[in-house]
Design a protein with these regions (language model features):
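Short, charged beta-turn/beta-strand-edge "cap" motif at the junction between a beta-strand
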Residues: 37-42
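Extracellular/periplasmic catalytic domains that process cell-envelope and extracellular macromolecules
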Residues: 25-26, 88
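Compact nucleic-acid interaction/catalytic patches
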Residues: 44-88
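Short hydrophobic-aromatic micro-motifs
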Residues: 33-34, 57
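Loop/turn positions that initiate beta-strands
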Residues: 28-31
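Short alpha-helix capping/helix-loop boundary micro-motifs
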Residues: 15-22
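C-terminal terminal-subdomain/extension
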Residues: 1-11, 83-148
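Residue-level recognition of conserved beta-strand positions in structured domain cores
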Residues: 36, 70-71, 98
Length: 148
């Protein structure tokens, strides 16, 4: 299947120049539909004319930047997938290996709040991935021990 990068580029320009009077207010633990675009390789693509995909807000850094994890309707038995059932009783998965930073301009609409237990489990999974690769000390290391 040929990817329409030109169409995504036009949508990306529209998103970048949008100055909505009513900005969304995403909160951690909530699933939102976002314009994530056409990606390269095995990264999760958006669908529809606006290249949308549901994502979970993992961390809010400020009113404009967020860490999100994309959702998939396909559950898989990999350690970087977090499989669960959404509020509509559909099996879905968070693809934690595809954690990414996105701008507020990509957020379209709120879907639902992830349960406390699922959110805590996903955060523990992400933390586990980060702890597997210990920071090196020495040149370039400026943070306190255990800063991550």
């Amino acid at each position: 299947m040929q990817k329409d990068f030109d169409k995504w580029n036009e949508e990306k320009k529209r998103l970048d120049s949008s100055e909505s009077e009513k900005r969304p207010f995403p909160r951690e633990q909530w699933v939102w539909v976002c314009s994530v675009g056409i990606n390269i390789g095995f990264e999760q693509n958006g669908t529809s004319n606006e290249f949308e995909r549901p994502v979970l807000v993992v961390k809010k850094f400020n009113n404009k930047m967020y860490w999100v994890v994309p959702l998939s309707s396909k559950q898989k038995p990999f350690d970087f997938y977090y499989n669960f059932t959404d509020p509509s009783e559909r099996p879905v998965a968070l693809i934690s290996s595809q954690l990414r930073l996105i701008s507020i301009q990509r957020f379209k609409r709120e879907m639902y709040k992830l349960s406390d237990i699922d959110f805590d489990n996903l955060r523990a999974q992400l933390k586990g991935f980060l702890e597997k690769s210990k920071p090196r000390t020495g040149r370039g290391f400026s943070g306190p021990e255990g800063a991550l």
